[in-house]
Swiss-Prot record:
It comes from Mus musculus (Mouse). Binds DNA as a dimer. May form homodimers. Interacts with ATF6. Interacts with SYNV1/HRD1; this interaction leads to CREB3L3 ubiquitination and proteasomal degradation. The chain crosses the membrane at residues 318-338. This is Cyclic AMP-responsive element-binding protein 3-like protein 3. Residues 1-317 are cytoplasmic. Expressed in adult liver (at protein level) and small intestine. Belongs to the bZIP family. ATF subfamily.
Length: 479
């Protein structure tokens, strides 16, 4: 009952106070009027130690206080704090500033005092001031270490811990409670009851433990029941940590399976698309192969036709016919075998009047005498190279001899030669009978007419006989 009263007194001041000094903590704990531990019964050895402390010298007193208040002399295996390698949440956090945890500084000296008087003489860190009587151990109860440690890292601050005000109590208030209850009964159930009273709804400092459905299911499956209020014991923390680890592993496995399923579905879709595309390409390849085979067959057929056409030899008769045709096309225009038939028809031939300028002038200046037909006597053939020396018998022959003896004989001869060439060219197409008719003597001039007028039928009658004969011979030679 005394422990409950002390716990009720220290709930609000200790949690709300600022970081205190060691002496203030001692005064707060051991003051006879207002101290928290004034009603707690101490062991007999502890009372004797306090009486002896009054009579000690200042040096012994300082040594005793250093033994009590020295942080380095405290037992590292204290059951009130979790070791650094434990699974609790306190061990995972970085060591905090001593000013942030004032209750611990108040509990360490008390524990140290309790331990100093339980050791034998000459063996403990504190010397015994009663040489014959050892310090008896004060009655205390073994408290589980897990009643202090709280894993804050494993619990989400959004779901488990609401935002605390500036004056919220520290999580180490439980150690002060244990210190207060250390002199009381040793039943663990009383400690749990005191903790529930300390963090109950009436105190205003309790924090509820919020569990998800999965956590509740796994806890029920494990057969563990967790309290709804904080803090938890170390065993409960380990169980909760294990449950949450399982939940995280389950969630990660579900996400992994989901991603794997999505990846496999994507691969299957791609595989189906690739399979359809592959089938389409195979159909196209088969179609192209068929077209290629048909084209190859057509090419072979064309090659066979070309080989057959080139292997046939050229016939000799065809070559001879081509040569004869070409020769005939070259030779036939110069032969003209149809000229006689053309000359026989009188309508096909049109006489052409050919005049010599010199002969025309001389003939125009003279008046031909009347000549009767048949009066011309044929004389000897005149020699072209020798001039005539005298007149020949017959008027026409004499006239032609005098004409040939004029000084312009050379020019006349050249003109006659030119006329002969023209006449020769014009008489190539005449027949032999026509040329023989020209050789016969005919009068050059009609009786009673002046000048040379050649009738249309006999356009060459003005040419001398010997010249006509020569022209006829030349024409016959060509034929």
């Amino acid at each position: 009952m005394d422990g409950d009263i002390a716990a009720g007194k220290m709930a609000s001041p200790v949690c709300a106070m600022a970081p205190l000094d060691s002496m203030e903590v001692l005064d707060l704990l051991f003051d006879r009027q207002d101290g928290i531990l004034r009603n707690v019964e101490l062991a007999e050895g502890w009372i004797l130690a306090r009486e002896e402390q009054k009579v000690l010298l200042n040096s012994d007193s300082d040594e005793f206080l250093n033994c009590i208040l020295g942080p380095g002399d405290s037992d590292p295996s204290s059951p009130l704090w979790s070791p650094a390698d434990s699974d609790s949440g306190i061990s995972e956090d970085l060591p905090s500033d001593p000013q942030d945890t004032p209750p611990r500084s108040g509990t360490e000296p008390a524990n140290t005092v309790a331990r100093c008087h339980t050791r034998e003489q000459g063996k403990g860190p504190c010397p015994s001031y009663l040489p014959s009587t050892p310090c008896p151990e004060p009655p205390r109860t073994q408290v589980q270490e897990s009643s202090v440690a709280i894993d804050l890292d494993m619990w989400s601050t959004d779901t488990l811990y609401p935002e605390e005000p500036a004056g919220s109590p520290s999580r180490f208030n439980l150690t002060v409670k244990e210190l207060l209850l250390s002199g009381g009964s040793g039943d663990l159930q009383q400690h749990s009851l005191a903790a529930s009273q300390l963090l109950g709804p009436g105190s205003g400092h309790c924090q509820e433990l919020v569990l998800t459905e999965d956590e509740k299911k796994l806890l029920a499956k494990e057969g563990v029941t967790l309290p709804t209020q904080l803090p938890l014991t170390k065993y409960e923390e380990r169980v909760l940590k294990k449950i949450r680890r399982k939940i995280r592993n389950k969630q990660s496995a579900q996400e992994s399976r989901k991603k794997k399923k999505e990846y496999i579905d994507g691969l299957e879709n791609r595989m189906s698309a690739c399979t359809a595309q592959n089938q389409e390409l195979q159909r196209k390849v088969l179609h192209l192969e068929k077209q290629n085979l048909s084209l190859l067959e057509q090419l072979k057929h064309l090659q066979a036709l070309v080989v057959q056409s080139t292997s046939k030899p050229a016939h000799a008769g065809t070559c001879i016919a081509v040569l004869l045709l070409s020769f005939a096309l070259i030779i036939l225009p110069s032969i003209s075998p149809f000229n006689s038939n053309k000359v026989d028809s009188p309508g096909d031939f049109v006489p052409v009047r050919v005049f010599s300028r010199t002969l025309h002038n001389h003939a125009a200046s003279r008046v031909a005498p009347d000549v009767t037909p048949g009066s011309e006597v044929p004389g000897p053939w005149p020699d072209v190279g020798t001039p005539h020396k005298g007149p020949s018998s017959g008027g026409l022959s004499a006239d032609w001899g005098n004409f040939l003896e004029i000084p312009m004989l050379d020019n006349l001869t050249e003109e006659l030669d030119n006329s002969t060439l023209v006449l020769a060219n014009s008489t190539e197409d005449l027949g032999r009978a026509t040329l023989l008719d020209w050789v016969a003597s005919e009068p050059l001039l009609s009786p009673g007419r002046v000048g040379l007028e050649i009738p249309g039928e006999m356009w060459l009658s003005w040419v001398p006989r010997w010249l006509r004969v020569r022209l006829v011979q030349d024409a016959l030679g060509v034929l």
